[in-house]
Amino acid sequence: MDLIDNLITYLTNPNPTADEAQAAFEPLTNGDYSDIHIAALLATLKARGETAADITGAARAFLKAARPFPITGAGVLDTAGTGGDGANTINISTGASLIVAAGGCRVVKCGNRSVSSRSGSADVLEALNIPLDLNPERAVHQVEASNFTFLFAPAYHPAVAHVMPVRRALRMPTIFNTLGPILSPARPALQIMGIANPELGQIIAEVFLELGRERALVVHGSGVDEIAVHGPTTIWELRNSTITNYTITPEELGLSRHPLAELAGGDGPENAAILREIFAGRGTPAQRDALAASAGAMFYLHDRTPTMREGAQLALQLLDDGTVATWLRTHEEANYA
């Protein structure tokens, strides 16, 4: 069977396996499909609805083609989300990642520049003078010195370039909007992933189980891809190979409830200025609580605290006692040669 026949067989199967999905996506990573075949693949999956097997197989194909990163697995947390919620808030998960790094937990964040919002994770980190675009050796030094590094996704996933012209032409969400946060070359044991579409929650949790994550939280917070302080958050938790679905509120985390409008952000430099204020202990209550909620979940995943509530309170303590501000002064513009 040639690769086009294999693709057609996959696309006409309403319930393919992860292995079949991987076999269909591997030619894409090698540049073997024409744009017409790529468009057929993406549009058909969009119409059928992506399953956990589709996403797992596609992820395996792109991880197989990815450039490796030396630090992997145990004790590594990634915090990427899907974006696309249209809320244009400050960079909550990125700011929370830095709080967690300052608190002694390792974060290897894989991401990109802004696509759908005014400020992506790379944009705000660049404005905070956190070194980006490091080669793997220097990125390892950065992790060892600071507990944090940022992996610029295009540098590790050159195969994604094969699909970009078609994605731009289609101008609609595709499986790649979901795949992006899953494709860290660090293959982290721990992950928190915010999703804009709550219908994906159980599916993504199943994908994390299949990809070997030890612990993961998939979160949707009242319309945004973060843990919310403006309403309840739905969580799908992977732990001990079991997926549990539940809801938490800001009050259950020991935090106050705030209007979403109080978390409005701007571009990279504007959001970086807001994060500096928060780290210096001068952020608004809404901004502090929003970062603490997400950081608390990250501390919980790392087993630094037994509950998310205690993690959120630890995050507030690290903001108040200057630990996070000191971390930023120490590590911005550092040379990791």
Positions of PLM-derived features:
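Residues in well-ordered alpha-helical elements
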Residues: 19, 36, 53, 137, ...
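Glycine-rich anion-binding loops and their surrounding alpha/beta cores
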Residues: 2-9, 15-16, 61-67, 71, ...
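Short amphipathic alpha-helical face segments that pack within enzyme cores
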Residues: 40, 95-99, 290, 294-297
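A glycine-rich phosphate/pyrophosphate-binding beta-strand-loop-alpha-helix module
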Residues: 42, 90-146
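Active-site cofactor/substrate anionic-group-binding motifs, chiefly glycine-
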Residues: 49-115
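N-terminal glycine-rich anion-binding loops that anchor highly charged ligand groups
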Residues: 1-2, 9-56, 64-71, 290
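Short beta-strand segments at enzyme active-site cores
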Residues: 37-38, 107-110, 218
